[in-house]
Amino acid sequence: MVFGTIGFSFIEGKTIIDSAYFVVVTMATVGYGDVHPVTTPGKILAVVIIVMGVGTFLGVIANITEIMLAKREMESRMKKLNMVIGVFYSEVGLGLLASFSRYDPDFDSIRPDLIVNANWTDKDFLKANKGSLSYNYSVDILRVDLPALKNFLMEKRGFLLRLLENPVLLEHQSFTDLLRAVFHVTEELAYRNTFIDTPEADSNHLATDIKRAYHLLVSEWIAYMKYLKNNYPFLFSLAVRTNPFNKNASVVIEN
């Protein structure tokens, strides 16, 4: 714009205002209008401006198209990712959450903040997330039924391995960390043939591994519930009715 204005002012001998008007008319109408260059250099400059204007327009269109395609691709990946996350919680996550929270001596202090319902807003999910991040997760390892936990996770070992191999998860670091934490607990338990007379140091080690997975399970569950609330109301309804933290949860709709 500045280049064209100065050029026409110098070549055609027009005022700055007339030159600016000339540039706008030339670019907007691709050279067609009541104003046109008289001199040969002016005509050449007009052609240059037209070409630059068309090039800029095409560049803008290309950028907009690229942004739209990238957004659509991202939405598609997010749908696939959350479908995988949903399968994980259905097969493994909900059972672990119910078990770990049952053995958490202080869980009742945070439980009310995790009773998700249909009236929740983004503000409620934010509050729940902040609470989950600041909460000191723990499990009473002496109360945990380690043989039952081992059997449960060993049954799901193949499923967890397939999830870890899923390329869709490469773009979701926090969920990948969750899978690794759960799989690590699986391996720790798998290598132990008995849990009778377990040394205190070993019990504490297992408690730390479970705590790591427990914390990540809750955080990712909150994010997943928010996604369902905003995108899939029918799936969210079932998720609310199977909330592992709600002692009164029932899949049956009473009213």
Predicted segment positions?
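Membrane-proximal, non-transmembrane interface segments of integral membrane proteins
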Residues: 71-151, 156
